């Protein structure tokens, strides 16, 4: 990669969550292997982000690579409208085997945000088929569900990165975020805000959508499993479909294969993505019940009106099958347990640091919440200089490493986080 390439990138390529006038620095990665990213200058840095929760087995995994090579000899892509293929059929078989029996219809798509859009369209079309104009979604504050329009409309309306679009988005309903954290006692007051809304607006609510247990980049909150149980009771009482967004948490990240298993509740619709292909190619899925699928399919329209160009892409399905085969060996369970133990041992004590508000650990997720906003450009540079890749946001420094990470590499991630907390220049103290 030449200096000309870097200059071109800086001038012409618009990176995510960045500016074209004053862009954040971009670090040139030329290859990746295991938990390491290799920079242009030859330096290897430890990836603490799993490329946004996705590369759970690390980079360049031989089994995943082999599945791609095998599939590409047959076909790299074919449209899914009116056509099917073995890789998609096998993947849907595997997904049905992994998920609750109630969820027996699978709609494939090409990203997590689209999986959410599909779920919302299913809800609206479901009620339309029943002769009811229900279009509002009930969720909770501090959530994040993606960057497309319907996904933005159910992400936190005030504190999210999407608030500049608020006046253009559908108006949905937001209950207060539960305050009972995962590892502490349940407080029944937490359900009251949600209960009041569902009691008052039940005839307008098309569905409830939540990130189960773990709220992602809306704030990295881990809430009590009882909250999900109470939500399920209310949804059942008012016959409102319940949707779980497991795009970030699915496939073992929290210590359970799916986060909703911590509460032993079953949704009516389930959205999956990110780690489904082991972070190799983009792929997502929305699973729903036979009741919802048949209600939609028995309406005047009779069809579900959605069809992404790359839906059911054979390469993506093939590598997803290989990824699930790795997970079926169950080595991930021990890996995540070991990560959680190390995070509890070494990350949790940072709660005593004067810059830190809270430290949270669940499965292979570690979160340090600070009093001050990070200076994104400076802290990113600091992390890279110290041999790690961590991408914070707002006041949150968090890590979601690949499950295969060694304890020495994990300790290094934690040590560099601790070191960053001692550096005043990395935080915008005025933005309290």
UniProtKB/Swiss-Prot annotation:
It catalyses: (8S)-8-amino-7-oxononanoate + S-adenosyl-L-methionine = S-adenosyl-4-methylsulfanyl-2-oxobutanoate + (7R,8S)-7,8-diammoniononanoate. GO terms for cellular component: cytoplasm. It is an enzyme of class 2 (transferase). Keywords: Aminotransferase, Biotin biosynthesis, Cytoplasm, Pyridoxal phosphate, S-adenosyl-L-methionine, Transferase. GO terms for molecular function: adenosylmethionine-8-amino-7-oxononanoate transaminase activity; pyridoxal phosphate binding. It is found in: Cytoplasm. Pfam families: Aminotran_3. The modification N6-(pyridoxal phosphate)lysine is found at residue 274. It comes from the Bacteria. Its cofactor is pyridoxal 5'-phosphate. One of its GO terms (biological process) is biotin biosynthetic process. Its EC number is 2.6.1.62. InterPro entries: Aminotrans_3, Aminotrans_3_PPA_site, BioA, PyrdxlP-dep_Trfase, PyrdxlP-dep_Trfase_major, PyrdxlP-dep_Trfase_small. Its main location: cytoplasm. Substrate binds at residues 52, 144, 274, 307, 391. The keyword NAD does not apply. Pyridoxal 5'-phosphate binds at residues 112-113, 245, 308-309. SUPFAM superfamilies: PLP-dependent transferases (SSF53383). Homodimer. NCBIfam families: bioA, PRK05964.1, PRK07986.1. Catalyzes the transfer of the alpha-amino group from S-adenosyl-L-methionine (SAM) to 7-keto-8-aminopelargonic acid (KAPA) to form 7,8-diaminopelargonic acid (DAPA). It is the only aminotransferase known to utilize SAM as an amino donor. PANTHER family: ADENOSYLMETHIONINE-8-AMINO-7-OXONONANOATE AMINOTRANSFERASE. This is Adenosylmethionine-8-amino-7-oxononanoate aminotransferase. It comes from Buchnera aphidicola subsp. Schizaphis graminum (strain Sg).
